[in-house]
Design a protein with these regions (language model features):
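Flexible glycine-rich active-site/ligand-binding loops centered on an Asp-His dyad
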Residues: 22-25
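Charged interaction scaffolds used for protein-protein
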Residues: 1-18, 29-48, 53-56, 60-98
């Protein structure tokens, strides 16, 4: 599964910036370690802390912002979900076994 979010936040200098991030496997694994929950739990609903942590993790991995999570979170102005891509968006290719 891949999620895409657009996050508007303030830089350390106070400038508003908008960043679009694609959340992938490494981000979900980090979220599982932090939250002590499984990614399947997100199917029941995703909270603000879930979304912002996933975005922060990707932003820091992409070296866009180096602040710790709590400091960065205080600067977030808005978060928008852009899309969800399934883990297997197409049907499997035919094989000799089918």
């Amino acid at each position: 599964m891949k999620l895409t979010f657009t996050v508007t936040y303030l830089t350390p200098a106070g400038k508003e910036t908008k960043t679009t991030v694609e959340i992938g496997i490494a981000d979900f694994a980090a979220w599982e370690r932090k939250s002590k929950r499984k990614v399947q739990d997100l199917q029941a609903g995703m909270g603000i802390d879930d979304m912002t942590f996933l975005c922060w993790h990707r932003i820091t991995k992409n070296k866009i912002d180096a602040r710790d999570y709590e400091t960065w979170l205080e600067s977030v102005q808005q978060i928008e979900a852009e899309g969800v891509e399934a883990a297997h968006p197409t049907a499997p290719a035919p094989s000799d076994d089918n």
